[in-house]
Each structure stands twice: as structure tokens, then as C-alpha cells.
Amino acid sequence: MKYRYATGAAVLSLCLGAAVVQAQGYYYLPPDAGPEFRFGIGPSFFEDGRFTQFGGPVSSKVDYDTGLAFDAALGWNFNKYVAADFETGFIGAKINNVPGFTSDNSRLYNVPFLFNVTLSCPIPRTNLIPYVGAGVGVADVVFDTDNFNDGVTTVTGSENNVVFAGQIFAGLRFQLTGHLSVDLGYKYFATGDPTFSYPPSPNFDVGFRGARTHSVLAALRFDF
């Protein structure tokens, strides 16, 4: 929650600061500069992972079902070529199989908090705008299970761990109006390795290799 407050405060300060200096006549905003908001949704394909800890070191392949990705971002267009934003959202999938373990309704969720920079290249005399970008920050990773066991020890419930996260992305945006566009984009997202502490003892750790995901998202973007 504190990351969301920090993101909102930072973007609000950025927008208010720009408005004040413009009103005072000290700074002229270039064409196409201003705030923007976007959100997107689509399928997410998790690379096969590794199960690394279950009360001690283990090594098993993790097979994921196709997951879901959603993101929302608020930011600032410096001009028609460069923009920066703060993004959060959701990237999660159900665990299909971990050899040697029973997994009942087990899922891995990632809630990212990222700072992105986007470079756009409008194609002259068209409404098409290709773009590429990258982002860094953290992700709150949640492991949620109804029953995960090795035949001896069982863990249930949800635990979370905050780890480093980053992404790269690219896509093609179509300008519908001066303030509204749609786009189709690809995103590669990766995190550090999360570890979750469960009963029966405070040090019973459940660990995974960090997520490596490929998402295809359809998005709406509003420029103000």
C-alpha cells in the first residue's frame, strides 16, 4: 500500500509543479507535453520456473498455466517522443505441476511497482506510433495455496515477499483522437527470487526462482 501512496504523491507533485511554473510564466510546455494515463490487459505466458526451497534446498521444475496480466500507469509526456510513468498492476498464474510435490489450487501473483521510460516514434502522415520502453522497481510477490506438500509437510494460505523487478516492452499505438489512443504491446517481465516463510516453524521457507513472463496486452491511453 505504501508504494501506491508514494506513486500517487510523486505523480501529483510532478503535475502540480508543471502547472505552477507554467502559470507563473517561467516555463513554456512544448507541444504534446502533459499528463497521461493508460491501462491494459491480456494473457501472460510464464516460462518454466524452478522450485528452490521447501524447508531446505530442493530443485524441481515448475510448470505454470497461462496467466493474466493487467497494468495501469500514470505519467508525463515530455514531448511526442519521450514519456515517463509509474506503473502497477498484476501478473499471475496458477501452478500446473511441480514434480515430487502435490499442488492444490496454488498460484503465484506479482504486483509490480515500476518506474518506466517510453520512447515513441510517430510515423509521419499516419496515426501509427511505434514505441519501446523499459522499467525498474520492485514487485510484491504472493504465493497462495490451498494445499502444497511433499508427502510429509504441508503448507497452506498466502505469504508474500517484496523483490526487485524489471521489464522491457514494445508495441504499436493507434491514435483515435487527439487525446485517446489504443495499442497492442508485448511485455517481458522478470523478478528476483522470492522466499515465503510458513509454519510449522518460523524458518520453514518456500522458495521459487523469480518469474519470467511474456505478456501480450491490449491497452487504452488517455493524454490530457
Predicted segment positions?
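Cleavable N-terminal export/targeting peptides
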Residues: 1-31
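Gram-negative (and chloroplast) outer-membrane scaffold detector with strong preference
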Residues: 24-28, 43-45, 73-150, 210-224
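Short coil turns and loop connectors of transmembrane beta-barrels in diderm outer membranes
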Residues: 31-33, 80, 123-127, 176-178, ...
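Surface-exposed strand-loop-strand hairpins of Gram-negative outer-membrane beta-barrel proteins
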Residues: 43-70, 158-161
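Predominantly the C-terminal beta-signal and adjacent terminal strand-loop region
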Residues: 93, 168, 173, 177-224
